[in-house]
Amino acid sequence: RLFKSDTNCNIHIAYGTIVNELKEVSRSYKEARMALDVGKIFFEGQDVIAYSQLGIGRLIYQLPIPLCKMFIKEIFGGKSPDDFDEEILTTINKFFENSLNVSETSRQLYIHRNTLVYRLDKLQKSTGLDLRVFEDAITFKIALMVVKYMKYMETLDY
């Protein structure tokens, strides 16, 4: 890690937008605070996070948990993404990393293209979402992020 002291403590840095007037410092501080929180959820490997980097994580972080639960239930039925085996989750994440490119994903996973297609078809049968279709891929990606957010929020509820 970039910032690690002798006491084994991790240091995380977050910052908001640059401001020109003193009255805007409060807003930038709130943005930095949010960047720190959202960074813990969606940017685990990063020690420095900017508010401008948060993307859709910033929106998900502000969703009420009951709405998240309803969304996940609609997308996955009674299932949870945790029910998927590690192989399919690795496949999905790699597929997203490669911008839904079947050939490049299969190459990076060291599997035949047809094996990847089979896995995607299998996922489509269980979820109704075809990750090769952009809209379905977005829905699935957001659902995975929402699940990650809900898990994080559960750890805060002692």
Each predicted region: which residue ranges?
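Cytosolic nucleotide-utilizing catalytic cores of signal-transduction proteins
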Residues: 1-158
